[in-house]
């Protein structure tokens, strides 16, 4: 294959369910290895914690009680040196609704 037909692709996966993110990352790496392309990853990135504190009593009267809500966002990074054929196969992977994917050509 010529160098022009191969490109480096950076895949960012993120989602609120860490098991789903890990499963999709594993499927991408398995597919890339099966097709014989060079792959780096999945590289775990720091988990982001979003915390929202809300007051329980809407009127402002009574005790000062608060609820704390938290959402964790797990992230993985995968680098693949892939051809157009591999990228087309990547598009066939079933991705749960809780996982978002960003593709970036480097």
Swiss-Prot record:
The keyword Transferase does not apply. InterPro entries: Ribosomal_uS10, Ribosomal_uS10_CS, Ribosomal_uS10_dom, Ribosomal_uS10_dom_sf, Ribosomal_uS10_euk/arc. Part of the 30S ribosomal subunit. Belongs to the universal ribosomal protein uS10 family. SUPFAM superfamilies: Ribosomal protein S10. It comes from Pyrobaculum aerophilum (strain ATCC 51768 / DSM 7523 / JCM 9630 / CIP 104966 / NBRC 100827 / IM2). PROSITE patterns: RIBOSOMAL_S10 (PS00361). GO terms for cellular component: cytosolic small ribosomal subunit. GO terms for biological process: translation. Involved in the binding of tRNA to the ribosomes. This is Small ribosomal subunit protein uS10. The gene is rps10. The keyword Aminoacyl-tRNA synthetase does not apply. Coiled coil: none annotated. Keywords: Ribonucleoprotein, Ribosomal protein. GO terms for molecular function: structural constituent of ribosome; tRNA binding. It comes from the Archaea. Pfam families: Ribosomal_S10. SMART domains: Ribosomal_S10.
